[in-house]
Amino acid sequence: MANHILYATDKNYCELCAVSLYSLLSNLHGEVVIHIIESSLEERKDDLIKIAKMFNKEIDFIPIEDISRRLVEADIPPYRGGYSPYARFFISDYVDDGRVLYLDCDTIIKGDVAPLINYDLNGCPLGAVIDQSSSHVNVLIGHHQHDRYYNSGILLFDVAKCRETDVPERFLEAVKTIDLSNTFLGADQEIMNVAYYHQIATLPQSANMMFTIRFFEPSQIWSVSSKGPSDYYTKEEFIASKNNPLIIHFAGGGRYQPWREEGIYYMDEDADLWFDTYEKLYPDGRYDVAKLKKIMNERKKHSFFKTAGTFPGLYCSLKGLYRGLKLLPKRIRARRAFKSGSSASSGD
């Protein structure tokens, strides 16, 4: 039974995808099949093929048009101009069996992902890492405040279970209940948490270590986000993951990404690893590594940048409350209707 790696990218994110792919294959032990859902990659496709060949691998490119067509037929509107954010949830239509590890392009891998791919999902169709965002987001999407809310940047799919529970169809049903112009933390993430409510296994936090939380203590996260060990991670799990992360996820937009001049990111070993990998692959690339390193090192001298990175939970809470309160009654009715329909279907 084969195991699989999945990315989704276009020509604008190709260089980020290349860095992640190179770091993945540099650390990988064992055989995997690599799939990339591509949108308008054109000649940039050769960048990724070249990296795969360095490690005697091939890439199965899946045109986004195949998935887009299905979404258009279901009257699903695009999100931010396209359908790429949704594509990962249709991978069971393209893979016969085994496990699929999906990775966002804004990641860098620091170890062998083989043990993660074989992680026990407890019968669930997919696994994810709990997001650090405020528990109030749960209320705003019609869930209980202390339900677990998951990040969609790194996902582990069990293909057989995806087919058994019809993951693509549940996604299509859920997206119809959501106003895509007013999502709190990204349409794909919100849809995932609604569509697979109580069907997502919790992965170790080390599988998706975000810059936005690495300077928190567990008690700070629990305080700022109104979470606790029951709907987040224990103190021991949190510290172990911070000390030995498997996958670094530069989530949070330009503020938390080392390749962006704007924002608050400052130099650390993960930024250094990203820059070194990028320079190796793109010595004349679009990012000026020397300039970026200088900016990051300057930021490191100022405590503000260290402090500013520790408030994403509060930021997400305020953002979610501001954007969501107006739509709260409508959202709760839609979610209850969706969950009621799902329960009726499962009882047939």
Model-based region annotation:
Residues M1-N3, T9, E164, P168-D348:
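A glycosyltransferase accessory/donor-loop signature
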Residues V33-S39, A128-V129:
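Short internal beta-strands
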Residues M1-Y22:
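N-proximal low-complexity "stem/linker" segments adjacent to membrane-targeting elements
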Residues R44, A52-D93:
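Active-site-proximal specificity loops/subdomain of glycosyltransferases
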Residues T107-I141:
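Conserved donor-nucleotide/metal-binding helix-loop-beta segment in metal-dependent transferases, i.e.
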Residues V100:
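Short aromatic/hydrophobic "clamp" motif used to bind/position activated sugar donors
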Residues S23-E31:
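Short, acidic, metal-binding catalytic loop of nucleotide-sugar glycosyltransferases
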Residues G153-C162:
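Short glycine- and hydrophobic/aromatic-rich loop-to-beta-strand nucleating segment
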